[in-house]
């Protein structure tokens, strides 16, 4: 078509394979979360308030108590042998939290939920090994990505980003092109000098949730004030959602610069210099 139609960006085969496994891993994680919520519902219906006394209902202490409740329904017992030494909740509060009684139908449902959670976790571990193997050839790129704030907390985070964007930033002439491709720039719906919508586009359906998750975690940390300062400034005038998208754009700009220049992240250069007006 004489270069009249711009081609779509399609990453290489290795990245597409990595992306497929990473998205499947995300679905497994969502399935695991759903099963945990169902298990918590069983406990709540049975008046077993373990979520009030344990920060993680599926931790060692809480899980051992749940297993005993399933194996000995309706039996009163002392919770002391099941409590881990590091548990800070008073024993009396934990004892009061297990005074409820679980019915047979709820016990069946809870047991199935716990078994399903364990099965999903096994599948996730197998997928993680395959993901690590596929990501091995991209180790230099991943090392650069992990210099960016928010991508250095867990190794899998940088792999997830890489699987969505690929290692080659030359396909995006500028960081603005990259941000637009990721779906983090406002649309320009205008007609007769009237602006109909400035909402962000629907592109990046898998990338944007990941960026928002990283941005929220980054804002909770005590480091990297350049992100927090920008978030607070925008939130004060335009609200939380627009401020979070602004942080996502900062992350995308940092990613584009790091991969384009093949240089580690620097707080001084996370944004391109703006041209003088």
Please name every model-derived segment.
Residues 1-277:
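A detector of single, family-specific signature residues
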